[in-house]
């Protein structure tokens, strides 16, 4: 009984902490941006089963937003080794499908290998839940939670990851760090870290000896072998394997599994037959009956948390205009795991020459990654200066700081993007169209503010009947007529 009370107290305390969480503020002048650029990755690390690309987190827009970005490509039968980070992260699946696992510390292993005949003495494998992922999925990874990912299909998997280094959960500095459990891979953000002189009076011989002992590159490789023998109760030969001794450097963070990975996981067909079980919306927080059903213990709040939510080409977008495009947003209201991360995401699709009207994010920075096609984008800062005026193309990233105004017009048949937001409940204010800032002002205020005649003020206020997505001009004329 005492343990149960302690667990409940822990949950209540954790809930309060998350409810009043905050982001660290960027350093002074980091958001005094006079010019933005559409950025491509500037570093690539090859591995046996794929590669990882990164954007420089020291660039001023990344420093202002307090985030780091990477893109991982997994080939057929490629396994990304388990790792965890010092800050929460969101992963968007741009392409492909496969399986992934995430380790919830302290939660039970609920997947069990079936007992085979004649193998009664062999211990059965038990592990935590394995999930399927597909194109368009958003995966939530809490701070310090180890996860792995595997591509079991022919199509390469492309996963874009955002790490929120400004999160209050990051107790280190603003440099992103990935802690691998195995392997001898290079840290993807290591080259961006400033090199500092080591203090102390350690001899050169001692330094070389320590470097040789730690050459494996993973968490386990740094421990003394006798420590691991004691901890795992295994012999020295197994410990050498755990520490990656004599492993080929080319393997890296992504390894190829010969013959494919054989693990216990629910079949994809089963998930497709019961999509409502995987994608069902979570209860309304105001529904007391719902709270009593879904929040009655640690297993049901943490260990069974839903970790993926599809926001790709969906049949039920949040905003839809058949002539302009669609927008789908994932927030903590429909994807509660995001309340742990204090992050959210938006998927958008724009038809050719359609426009996302000028708007701004009230309470979040926006990290826009172009998935497909190209669009003409303009961004304006608080001084009325156009800090970006150019094309955003597939594979490029554009960071729009909080309250900076932005507008986009598709230049291709179908421009698609995903926008990561640094708030789990972001708000957008549109400057034009229905329900916009100007639409909500009295005509007289518009007239006096912009020195317009009354009829002109009425046109500014009412001529655009659309809210966020505006069709091409030809379609607009037909609608107005």
Swiss-Prot record:
It is found in: Endoplasmic reticulum; Protein storage vacuole. During soybean germination, seed storage proteins are hydrolyzed by protease/26S proteasome. Keywords: Allergen, Disulfide bond, Endoplasmic reticulum, Seed storage protein, Signal, Storage protein, Vacuole. Gene3D superfamilies: Jelly Rolls. InterPro entries: 11S_seedstore_CS (IPR022379), 11S_seedstore_pln (IPR006044), Cupin_1 (IPR006045), RmlC-like_jellyroll (IPR014710), RmlC_Cupin_sf (IPR011051), Seed_Storage-Functional (IPR050253). A motif (Vacuolar targeting signal) lies at residues 472-481. Residues 271-290 have a biased composition (Basic and acidic residues). Residues 36-240, 309-458 form the Cupin type-1 domain. It comes from the Eukaryota. This is Glycinin G3. It comes from Glycine max (Soybean). The gene is GY3.
């Amino acid at each position: 009984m005492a343990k149960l009370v302690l667990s409940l107290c822990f949950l209540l305390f954790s809930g309060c902490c998350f409810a009043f969480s905050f982001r660290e503020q960027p350093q002074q002048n980091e958001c005094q941006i006079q010019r933005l650029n559409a950025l491509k990755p500037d570093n690539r690390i090859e591995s046996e089963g794929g590669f990882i690309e990164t954007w420089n987190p020291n660039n001023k827009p990344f420093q202002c937003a307090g985030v780091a970005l990477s893109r991982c490509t997994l080939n057929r039968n490629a396994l990304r080794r388990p790792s965890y980070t010092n800050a929460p992260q969101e992963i968007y699946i741009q392409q492909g499908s496969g399986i992934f696992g995430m380790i919830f510390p302290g939660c039970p292993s609920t997947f069990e290998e079936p007992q085979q005949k004649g193998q009664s003495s062999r211990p059965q494998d038990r592990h935590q839940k394995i999930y399927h992922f597909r194109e368009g999925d958003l995966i939530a990874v809490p701070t310090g939670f180890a996860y792995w990912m595997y591509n079991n299909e022919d199509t390469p998997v492309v996963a874009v990851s955002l790490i929120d280094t400004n999160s209050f959960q990051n107790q280190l500095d603003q440099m992103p760090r990935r802690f691998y459990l195995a392997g001898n891979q290079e840290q993807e953000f290591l080259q961006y870290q400033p090199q500092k002189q080591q203090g102390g009076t350690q001899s050169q011989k001692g330094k070389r000896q320590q470097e040789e002992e730690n050459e494996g590159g993973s968490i386990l490789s740094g421990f003394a072998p006798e420590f691991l023998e004691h901890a795992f109760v295994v012999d020295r030969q197994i410990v050498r394997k755990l520490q990656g001794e004599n492993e080929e450097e080319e393997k890296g963070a992504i390894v190829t599994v010969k013959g494919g990975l054989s693990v216990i996981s629910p079949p994809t067909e089963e998930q497709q037959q019961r999509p409502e079980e995987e994608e069902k919306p979570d209860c309304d927080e105001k529904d007391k009956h719902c709270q009593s059903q879904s929040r009655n213990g640690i297993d049901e709040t943490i260990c069974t948390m839903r970790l993926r939510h599809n926001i790709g080409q969906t049949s039920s977008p949040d905003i839809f205009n058949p002539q302009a495009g669609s927008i789908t947003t994932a927030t903590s209201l429909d994807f509660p795991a995001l309340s742990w991360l204090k992050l959210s995401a938006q998927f958008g699709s724009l038809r050719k020459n359609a426009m996302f009207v000028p708007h701004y994010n009230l309470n979040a920075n926006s990290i826009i990654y172009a998935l497909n096609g190209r669009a003409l984008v303009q961004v304006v800062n608080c001084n009325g200066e156009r800090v970006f005026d150019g094309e955003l193309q597939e594979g490029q990233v554009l960071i729009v700081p909080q309250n900076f105004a932005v507008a986009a017009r598709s230049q291709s048949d179908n421009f698609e993007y995903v926008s990561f937001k640094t708030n789990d409940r972001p708000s957008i204010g549109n400057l034009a169209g229905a329900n916009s800032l100007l639409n909500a002002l009295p005509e007289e205020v518009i007239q006096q503010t912009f020195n317009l005649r009354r009829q002109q003020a009425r046109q500014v206020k009412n001529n655009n009947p659309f809210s966020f997505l505006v069709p091409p001009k030809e379609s607009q004329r037909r609608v107005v007529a």
